[in-house]
A protein has these predicted regions:
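Phosphate/NTP-binding elements of NTP-utilizing enzymes
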Residues: 2-267
């Protein structure tokens, strides 16, 4: 029997062996930090660690999350790792609700690739607004939009697909059916903040895990940055309502978290 040749070029086999653990690969990535306005090492926080564990274990994942906790960034790093480690011309899709959103997520792919040390930046055969393709294996990251022409994904086969802000898709049922047909047994990740009660996304969450979707739930109060210095003691600030007091006790929240919550609701 012929031995299958590894087509990944220029990367020593011991490095590829090390990179079988995506956390080792992530150590070489950098991400843009809004606070410092600079690229910083990509270090996983607790929610991202939990999500990565789920990505490595499950094939159908639905994520229920608060905003700005880094889930989409983690999935983009994970997809770059999948493409990087593949020795075949696999296609990994990012599908978002608008062209601007899809382009932004694809720009994260490019930023991650360009942040790699030069010896790890394998030659690209294509780098465009929608596609990043490795020249040696043909593995690629490609972006699509859910608001474009109906069935735009039908012409493509996917090894994996990331559906970002799925709750805001104009036709969740049709697009998910297309993606599942295109991906076959490949991995599908639904990642979004909630939008409407009773939509397909809501149904998938309520049906998990019996519907073969693994739910990753990341509530806002578990994210360390979602807190503020409490202002409840100020003379002009209304005290916490009975509902707020109950919520704080039920979920073991701090006054700082409750003040953050109130400020978000009022804004």
């Amino acid at each position: 029997m012929a031995v299958k040749k590894n087509r990944i070029s220029k990367i020593p086999s011991e490095v590829l062996e090390r990179f079988k653990d995506p956390r080792q690969f992530f150590k070489f990535l950098k991400v843009f930090d809004k606070q410092s306005n600079a690229l910083v090492p990509f270090q996983l926080h607790d929610e991202q660690e939990a999500l990565l564990d789920a990505l490595l274990e499950h094939n159908r994942i639905v994520i229920l999350k608060a905003r700005q906790i880094g889930c989409s960034t983690l999935v983009r790093a994970y997809f770059l790792w999948k493409a990087f480690m593949s020795s075949e011309p696999t296609r990994h899709a990012i599908i978002s609700y608008s062209r601007d959103s899809a382009d932004h997520l694809h720009s994260i792919d490019k930023e991650f690739y360009l942040s790699l040390p030069k010896p790890l930046q394998r030659k690209l055969s294509k780098s465009s607004a929608r596609t990043l393709r490795l020249g040696d294996t043909g593995a690629e990251l490609r972006s699509f939009t859910a608001s474009g022409k109906a069935g735009a994904t039908r012409s493509f086969a996917f090894s994996s697909a990331h559906l970002s802000e799925f709750a805001f898709f104009p036709d969740q049922s049709d697009l998910l059916a297309n993606v599942m047909a295109s991906a076959g047994e490949g991995q599908i990740i639904i990642e979004t903040t909630p939008n409407n009660v009773g939509d397909l996304y809501h149904e998938i969450i309520l049906g998990s895990p019996g519907n073969d979707w693994h739910l990753c739930f990341f509530p806002w109060y578990e994210h360390g940055s979602y807190t503020k210095k409490s202002q409840f003691h100020q003379p002009q600030i209304p005290d916490m309502s009975a509902e707020e007091i109950k919520l704080m006790k039920d979920h073991n929240l701090t006054k700082g978290q409750m003040w953050w919550r109130r400020s978000q609701i009022s804004s």
